[in-house]
């Protein structure tokens, strides 16, 4: 059986009050439309078409790596019109098409699989996703036959007294037999107060033709649409709860899961402990037995097992097994830190490699450098990597001891087994086995205060 999907992503999203298309706003680090695409793919649906409109180039930019096709809806004339715009995608296809909305990011791949299985096994012409709610005010009601099949969808304003009591609502997500859908679209009209083509009218057309229509009921949170910043926040809360619950089930400890913010694609190993206020973003991987103390941010990075991070920022970097970072360290992109290293307080490292067992304990800047293993950086060391025009590289070998308040003027090389005296400004290569001293001699002028009349008696 051939299965495919259409995702409606052409809405303007006026209530978002944004210059961006609604569907590219993110929920837990991923664009809403990409949540839907990815869950469709997890349900083994490979052929996906996006109906786009206002801000189409932006939507394409955010979905270009998702291997989808696009249909253009120049004018937003309703959900039925959006599907009509995708007729070319459906042309000559036989099988089943599911239709989802790009602003409902909480739909799960399990529900999508259930939708296709229910639809295909029951040989329905159409299957709706519905939900039951305590207050259905404003929603279209699902009215069922005695057999359980769907009889019709009635908009709230058109409900009679009995229909108003129904609390099963329409989600706007469907499965259709492709041939029946295309034939029904030919009879779709815009004879309504809004002058729009509604996909719900297709259900009525099918029923009038004697077709079989079913529905599956899912939790309301799965069909929540996002039309405002308030609803975006509500979706974020639901998604975050799901994400954190998944990690806890897999053996991760959260001291306070309600104040821990983890993006949907983050991977975390078991026996890792995460304290409140941590933000873990992008395609980050945290291995086993790590400890992330409060107010740390990690983005698009790999953190190996046994790492401790305290009040620090790590961006697009790799931190080796057993290393400690922080407090108040800043690890900038393209940094690779080895095993059992120590990156201490107020240390900034940018685009550099730090070897195993190296200690950079405090108040140090390292940029565009290769640093070997078992080195020690004294407090106040600066790798001076910028000459005013471009960044230069510094190379430091193994077992180098860098004294406090040292300036390493790039490009420069410090070889293995070297010492640099505190307060030095190094501009030339330091040979292996050497002690480098590059500072002015101390001069004591005896009696100077008395001569200047500054001596206090």
From Swiss-Prot:
GO cellular component, one term: membrane
Keywords: Acyltransferase, Cell shape, Cell wall biogenesis/degradation, Cytoplasm, Magnesium, Metal-binding, Multifunctional enzyme, Nucleotidyltransferase, Peptidoglycan synthesis, Repeat, Transferase
Pathway the protein takes part in: Nucleotide-sugar biosynthesis; UDP-N-acetyl-alpha-D-glucosamine biosynthesis; N-acetyl-alpha-D-glucosamine 1-phosphate from alpha-D-glucosamine 6-phosphate (route II): step 2/2; Nucleotide-sugar biosynthesis; UDP-N-acetyl-alpha-D-glucosamine biosynthesis; UDP-N-acetyl-alpha-D-glucosamine from N-acetyl-alpha-D-glucosamine 1-phosphate: step 1/1; Bacterial outer membrane biogenesis; LPS lipid A biosynthesis
Enzyme Commission identifier(s): 2.7.7.23, 2.3.1.157
InterPro entries recorded: Bifunctional_GlmU, GlmU-like, GlmU_C_LbH, Hexapep, NTP_transferase_dom, Nucleotide-diphossugar_trans, Trimer_LpxA-like_sf
Cofactor: how bound: Binds 1 Mg(2+) ion per subunit.
Residues noted as binding Mg(2+) in the record, renumbered to the chain: 103, 227
Binding site for UDP-N-acetyl-alpha-D-glucosamine: 8-11, 22, 73, 78-79, 140, 155, 170, 227, 332, 350, 365, 376
Region (Linker) residue spans: 230-250
Renumbered residue ranges of the record's region Pyrophosphorylase: 1-229
The keyword Flavoprotein is annotated on this UniProt entry: no
Active-site residues (renumbered): 362 (proton acceptor)
Reaction(s) the record says it catalyses: alpha-D-glucosamine 1-phosphate + acetyl-CoA = N-acetyl-alpha-D-glucosamine 1-phosphate + CoA + H(+); N-acetyl-alpha-D-glucosamine 1-phosphate + UTP + H(+) = UDP-N-acetyl-alpha-D-glucosamine + diphosphate
Residues reported in the UniProt entry to bind acetyl-CoA: 385-386, 422, 439
Region ranges (N-acetyltransferase): 251-457
One function term, GO molecular function aspect: magnesium ion binding
Top class in the EC scheme: transferase
Any Gene Ontology biological process: UDP-N-acetylglucosamine biosynthetic process
Highest taxon of the lineage: Bacteria
Keyword Acyltransferase assigned: yes
Function text: Catalyzes the last two sequential reactions in the de novo biosynthetic pathway for UDP-N-acetylglucosamine (UDP-GlcNAc). The C-terminal domain catalyzes the transfer of acetyl group from acetyl coenzyme A to glucosamine-1-phosphate (GlcN-1-P) to produce N-acetylglucosamine-1-phosphate (GlcNAc-1-P), which is converted into UDP-GlcNAc by the transfer of uridine 5-monophosphate (from uridine 5-triphosphate), a reaction catalyzed by the N-terminal domain.
Subunit architecture: Homotrimer.
Protein name per its UniProtKB record: Bifunctional protein GlmU
């Amino acid at each position: 059986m051939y299965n495919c999907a259409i995702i409606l992503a052409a809405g303007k999203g006026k209530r978002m009050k944004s210059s961006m298309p609604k569907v590219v706003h993110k929920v837990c680090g991923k664009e809403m439309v990409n949540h839907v695409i990815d869950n469709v793919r997890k349900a083994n649906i490979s052929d996906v078409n996006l109906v786009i409109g206002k801000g189409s180039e932006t939507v394409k930019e955010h979905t270009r790596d998702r291997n989808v096709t696009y249909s253009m809806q120049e004018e937003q004339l309703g959900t039925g019109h959006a599907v009509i715009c995708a007729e070319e995608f459906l042309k000559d296809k036989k099988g089943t098409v599911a239709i989802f909305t790009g602003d409902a990011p909480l739909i799960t791949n399990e529900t999508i699989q259930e939708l296709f299985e229910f639809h295909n096994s029951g040989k329905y012409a159409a299957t709706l996703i519905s939900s039951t709610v305590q207050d259905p005010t404003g929603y279209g009601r699902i009215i069922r036959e005695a057999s359980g099949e769907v009889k019709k969808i009635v908009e709230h304003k058109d409900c009679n007294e009995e229909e108003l009591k129904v609390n099963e609502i329409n989600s706007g997500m469907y499965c259709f037999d492709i041939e029946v859908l295309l034939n029904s679209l030919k009879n779709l009209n815009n004879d309504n107060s809004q002058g729009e083509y509604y996909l719900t009218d297709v259900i009525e057309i099918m029923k009038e033709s004697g077709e079989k229509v079913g529905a599956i009921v899912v939790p309301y949170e799965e069909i929540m649409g996002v039309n405002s910043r308030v609803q975006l926040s509500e979706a974020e809360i639901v998604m975050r709860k799901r994400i954190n619950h998944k990690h806890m089930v897999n053996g991760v400890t959260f001291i306070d899961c309600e104040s821990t913010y983890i993006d949907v694609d983050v991977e975390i190993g078991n026996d890792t402990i995460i304290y409140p206020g941590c933000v873990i973003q992008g395609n980050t991987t945290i291995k086993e037995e790590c400890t992330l103390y409060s107010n740390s941010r990690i983005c698009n990075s790999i953190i190996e097992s046994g790492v401790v991070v305290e009040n620090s920022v790590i961006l697009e970097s790799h931190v080796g097994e057993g290393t400690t970072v922080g407090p108040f360290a800043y690890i900038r992109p393209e940094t690779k830190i080895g095993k059992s290293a120590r990156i201490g307080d107020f240390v900034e490292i940018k685009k550099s490699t730090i070897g195993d067992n190296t200690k950079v304990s405090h108040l140090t800047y390292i940029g565009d450098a290769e640093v070997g293993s078992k080195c020690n950086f004294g407090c106040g060391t600066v790798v001076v990597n910028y000459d005013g025009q471009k960044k230069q590289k510094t190379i430091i070998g193994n077992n180098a001891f860098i004294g406090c308040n040292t300036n390493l003027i790039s490009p420069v090389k410090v070889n293995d087994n070297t010492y640099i005296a505190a307060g030095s400004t190094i501009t030339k290569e330091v040979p292996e086995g050497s002690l480098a001293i590059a500072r002015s001699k101390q001069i004591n002028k005896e009696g100077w205060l008395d001569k200047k009349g500054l001596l206090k008696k």
